[in-house]
């Protein structure tokens, strides 16, 4: 295994853990799309505190995960 693969596995596990932590918070957070809940994506929500931090962290991790995936795909 290359170092980039290990980093991607760790990031994927972190994203899953954060998604599971956010899944009990409303219908817009976490893994709501997988559980069949109604998604209210364009509704304004006032998330504060740890929920907001987890949402931003998950967004950043997913973007980095996609970038690393593209780099890994085109590098080999």
Swiss-Prot record:
Keyword Transferase part of the UniProt annotation: no
Segments traversing the membrane: 3-23, 56-76
Keywords of the record: Cell membrane, Membrane, Protein transport, Translocation, Transmembrane, Transmembrane helix, Transport
GO annotations of cellular component type: plasma membrane
Membrane found in the keyword field: yes
Matches recorded under InterPro entries: SecG
Domain of life: Bacteria
Compartment(s) of residence: Cell membrane
GO MF terms, alphabetically ordered: protein-transporting ATPase activity
Recorded topology in the membrane: Multi-pass membrane protein
Any one GO BP annotation for this protein: protein secretion
Family as reported in the entry's similarity comment: Belongs to the SecG family.
Record NCBIfam families: secG
Function noted in UniProt: Involved in protein export. Participates in an early event of protein translocation.
UniProt-recorded name of the protein: Probable protein-export membrane protein SecG
Organism of this sequence: Mycoplasma pneumoniae (strain ATCC 29342 / M129 / Subtype 1) (Mycoplasmoides pneumoniae)
């Amino acid at each position: 295994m290359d170092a980039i693969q290990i980093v991607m596995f760790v990031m994927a596990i972190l994203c899953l853990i954060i998604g599971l932590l956010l899944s009990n918070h409303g219908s817009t957070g976490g893994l709501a799309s997988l559980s069949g809940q109604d998604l209210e994506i364009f509704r304004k929500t006032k998330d504060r505190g740890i929920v907001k931090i987890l949402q931003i962290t998950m967004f950043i991790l997913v973007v980095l995960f996609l970038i690393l995936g593209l780099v890994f795909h085109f590098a080999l």
